[in-house]
Amino acid sequence: MSTPDPREDLGRLAALHSLRQSGGYKGTTLVLSLLVLTIVIGMAVLVAVRGDGDESSTQPPQVTATDTPTSGTPQTPVTRLPDDAFGVPTTDTRGRRVETPTNPLGQVLPQTTDPSDTDEPEAVLPPPEGLMWQRVYGATIPFSTSDGPTAISTDGVPTGFAHTPQGAALAAWQIGQRATWAPDDQNAALLDRAAVVSAAAEPEADNLRTNGAQIYAGNPGLPAQMRDVPVAVRITTYSSDFAHVEFAQPLTRDDGFTAISVGVDMVWRGGQWKWVVPEPGNDPSRLLISTTGDGWTPW
């Protein structure tokens, strides 16, 4: 298999930037979820020193705005999965199993296990019970049988995450991925009901409400690994009303760094975890030598 030219990914990002600046998209900046955008930019910029040249850039299929209803009626929490809940499973680019739900919004799972009661910020964060990664909007999104979610509204807002570190981590990745890849009407619902937006972050949220899905409408072909299962997760700060969650994705570089991480702030408001939309200039990404120890654990 031929080795892909890393400059192609940089070129795609440059073309998108040029299009946004010329008015091809609404607004002067088009903000994706920080969960994915930081990793996209970091990996595209750093890809020139990668050594793994055989990863596919084929994009998983995406659902469009016409695939889902737009009202906010929640799913009823399930006690038993329907027989046709899932189609044929797939894998991400690293071979991790990903289920294919027949519901394009994702399939909530029966909550059959008590949530974790671990709240030590320095403790290793084990995955929730019954963790399942599902392909939703072409991305990989986590569900569990212990820490939620317990419902998803028909306009794509997940709820019912446990008031635990695992619940915060599940909510962070769920909300971030949905805000990145979902149709724009669902982006708006997520930001209205599952996010906290400061005055400084409002321009970023406005762009995401109206432009989120448009960046991929032209099929720019960003690397497929942007939709992968995170290689490791950790929580560095946790209290009853706040959690700082970090996710890592792998890199192969000549200087010893093996991954790039991004941090996400979550707050507990109104009985649910909500994503704190980052303000402009906030860059919580960093390079990692290892995702072994130091609180990191694979999920």
Positions of predicted regions on the chain:
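Terminal targeting segments of Actinobacterial cell-envelope proteins
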Residues: 1-27
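Structured, amphipathic secondary-structure segments that form assembly/contact surfaces
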Residues: 3-9, 184-272, 277-298
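Hydrophobic membrane-insertion alpha-helices, especially the h-region
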Residues: 31-45
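C-terminal region of N-terminal signal peptides and the immediate post-cleavage residues
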Residues: 42-62
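Short extracytoplasmic/periplasmic juxtamembrane "stem" segments immediately C-terminal to an N-terminal membrane anchor
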Residues: 58-75
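Residue-level signal for pocket-adjacent positions within structured domains
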Residues: 76, 81, 156
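Short beta-strand edge/turn micro-motifs at domain boundaries
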Residues: 81-147, 261-289
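Core segments of small alpha/beta cavity-forming domains
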Residues: 139-213
